[in-house]
A protein has these predicted regions:
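Metal- or metallocofactor-binding catalytic centers and their adjacent structured scaffolds
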Residues: 1-46
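Conserved, mostly hydrophobic/aromatic
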Residues: 2, 35, 48, 92, ...
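Generic secondary-structure signature for well-ordered alpha-helical cores
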Residues: 3-11, 26, 86, 112-116, ...
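Flexible, glycine/charged-enriched surface loops at secondary-structure junctions
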Residues: 12-14, 51-54, 147-154, 225-227, ...
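Glycine-rich, aromatic-flanked loop segments that form ligand/cofactor-binding clefts
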Residues: 37-69
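Metal-dependent enolase-superfamily TIM-barrel catalytic cores that perform enediolate-based chemistry
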Residues: 56-167
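Shared catalytic-loop signature of beta/alpha-barrel
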Residues: 144, 155-172, 177-277
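Structural signal for terminal/edge beta-strands and the immediately following C-terminal loop/tail
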Residues: 210, 269-270, 274-297
Length: 297
């Protein structure tokens, strides 16, 4: 439904493309993201510039990235954390959920293992209720957590505001903010300090810039995250993070997660820093370079 509606559109008419796509079908942000990123890539290649220049220019030469620790036993978590720090990654994102006391124990064990220099971010993926979240926050309050990401369900704005106010903790929202309208609602409420932007859940770079602008207007930070994308998707995220002024901490750009990819990136991973480079557009090599057949029909 989307592609037939935008056939023939100029690659520079990105705002118009979004109007057409939204009129053609509701939601389906991932599909709209694919079209949006393709248009941005083509337009910046037509101009002969890297994508980040089309998004407002370079705000930083490189983007810090973090590493993830899933829900596992303390021994495994500590081993992973030490390994990440030894590689130079000083920002660790820990997933939590299920038994609250087990999560508290794991976070405290990792904090003790990596010392005070490494940053620890918590992500509950909306898995706690207010009582559980309160118990967890009290249990790790002295662990110097950088962000508590989406502790509560995305619809529970009142309890999120209460958690933020009652504990004074830095809250990062992910699942709750998929659209500019949701960003306004949460920014006005004072429920959070920052938003996570994932291109596939907001509809692409055009909407992502709108959300980031709302956050900036309210003095809030942004974390750009990829969702185990190929180099194409992660590259678009990297260019966005390079261009946004309100990136205040490491981003979740999971370039290291792709085992088999449809493209090869020209971006440079140097320790915990990811560099967008100056190639035109997103900055990935054509699939044809690897002998793959592309169906242009």
């Amino acid at each position: 439904m989307i592609l037939p509606a935008i056939v023939g559109i100029d690659c520079f008419d990105i705002a118009r493309a979004h109007i057409i796509m939204d009129n053609a079908i509701a939601e389906n942000h991932a599909a709209k993201c694919a079209v949006d990123c393709a248009l941005h890539d083509l337009a910046s290649k037509e101009l002969g510039i890297p994508l980040y220049q089309m998004l407002g220019g370079k705000c930083r030469d490189s983007v810090s990235i973090n590493r993830h620790i899933g829900i596992m036993d303390n021994v495994q978590a500590v081993s992973l954390a030490k390994d990440f720090v030894s590689q130079g990654f000083m920002s660790i994102k820990m997933k939590v959920g299920g038994n609250v006391q087990s999560n508290i124990s794991r976070v405290r064990a990792v904090r003790e293992a990596v010392g005070d220099d490494a940053k620890i971010r918590i992500d509950a993926n909306a898995g706690y209720n207010y009582t559980q979240a309160s118990e967890f926050v009290k249990g790790v309050y002295d662990c110097n957590v950088e962000y508590y990401e989406q502790l509560l369900p995305k619809w529970d704005i009142d309890q999120t505001v209460a958690l933020h106010k009652n504990f004074g903790i830095p809250i990062l929202l992910d699942e709750a903010v998929n659209t500019p309208e949701q960003a306004v609602r949460y920014a006005v409420s004072g429920a959070a300090d920052a938003f996570t932007i994932k291109l596939c859940k907001c509809g692409g770079l055009y909407r992502a810039k709108q959300i980031a602008g709302i956050a900036e207007a309210f003095g809030m930070g942004i974390v750009v995250a990829s969702t185990y994308d190929t180099h194409i998707g992660c590259g678009a995220c990297l260019h966005l993070a390079t261009a946004l002024p309100n990136i205040q901490s490491a981003c979740d750009l999971t370039t290291y997660a792709s085992q088999k990819d449809i493209a090869k990136s020209c971006h440079v991973l140097n320790g915990m820093q990811l560099h967008a480079g100056d190639s035109y557009g997103i900055g990935v090599f054509s699939m044809n370079d690897f002998g793959m057949t592309v169906n242009n029909a």
